[in-house]
Amino acid sequence: MQIRDSVFIVTGGASGLGAGTARALAAQGGRVVVADLNKAAGEALAKELGAGARFAECDVSSEASAKAAVDLAVSAFGGLNGLVNCAGIAIGEKTLGKEGPHQLATFARVININLIGTFNMIRLAAEAMSRGQPNAAGERGVIVNTASVAAFDGQIGQAAYAASKGGVVGMTLPMARELAS
């Protein structure tokens, strides 16, 4: 996909891989919505990136919050051409540790953000992309999911993280096949 003049949402965009991705897209002439819960860092990055960037305070696991980020991209830049899913958390906790069994709430939180949040963003972004006109190459959009080697080779204390990233890996191909057809 041609990056110049295309509109992208980068989740987890205020730090780490997400911030690096947002900077790279902006450097190539893309317009970027930095979607993240960290308002201070997100606003600072959007300001750094200039007029072609916006910040959306976004909880990827919330339908309303995710939809607001998609709506911002469409209203600010006229459409949506790409989504890069970088949002995620890694909370290390053993299945059975010194303090007892792994907290179910911790496991659920990691799955909710890393897996369900990724799915949530994909479904909403895909719908927005489907409303746009194809570019000169016939493309309507692109979605990039980030996973981890932990999906295939998780380590001690990574049950929740490995399961969440394994889920991202597992859903990416069937969704890609569906959206490509």
Please provide the spans of the model-predicted regions:
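The beta1-alpha1 cofactor-binding region of Rossmann-like NAD(H)/NADP(H)-dependent oxidoreductases
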Residues: K39-A40, A56-A68, L104
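Active-site helix of classical SDR
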Residues: I122, S164, T172
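Catalytic Tyr-X3-Lys loop
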Residues: I89, G100-N120, V144, Y161, ...
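Canonical Rossmann dinucleotide-binding motif of NAD(H)/NADP(H)-dependent dehydrogenases/reductases
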Residues: Q2-V33
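Alpha-helical segment proximal to the catalytic Tyr-Lys
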Residues: E127, R177-E178
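Conserved glycine-rich Rossmann-like NAD(P)H-binding loop of the short-chain dehydrogenase/reductase
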Residues: Q28-L45
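Conserved mid-core segment of classical short-chain dehydrogenase/reductases
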Residues: A90-A108, E127, R131-A137, G157-A160
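Residue(s) in the substrate-gating loop at a strand-loop-helix junction
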Residues: S148
